[in-house]
């Protein structure tokens, strides 16, 4: 996609001086500190548009990540509205059928990558994997607790699910969890965790934590795949970066290694 004409005022309209600086500083890392409702999302929207319009960056080279589907939809709508204003100013856009920026949550971006690449890896999944939500996880854990003969009152599915999720967010698998366990309860959790993960793999299913950790594992074990995405994503923008957990942080770090345009 290629854009012509001088920069329209719309790209900076309504921004304060600090926001304008963030929009115009496109190379290297930029961190915006601001409270809720202070215009961070608006700044990211204008920065994304500035990259495409003024810097003539192919939208396919831009990755925009949010933490919720609601925020992702809001960002997409804001970008669409901003471009509508630009078009109304007779700002010409060439090749409008070109790919749009990659926009979505960490999880949706990981799903997209894994659907494309997981068959090329040693991960024990195929590209048509299913995704378990919290209810699916709890039902599976409930069955495992029953099959292993544990007291369902002591091993509440919600609690067990949270403990497994916490372990995965630190890249602690069931065998490592077992080594770290120092009492009956945690040794039992490690056994539930082991069975949980085996049944997930046997069902070709991932939970939300798997989506993140498996993408990190994929990139680390296949540098050639990582290289392709590093070359693609020349600019990475993340809403609410301070809320990233370890797998999300590692994903961003891996993807931004070449350009550091984040």
Kindly give the residue locations of the regions a language model identified.
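Amphipathic alpha-helical segments within well-ordered protein domains
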Residues: 49, 80, 142-146, 197, ...
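Short alpha-helix boundary/capping elements
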Residues: 48, 110, 114, 167-172, ...
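P-loop NTPase Walker
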Residues: 2-124, 131, 227
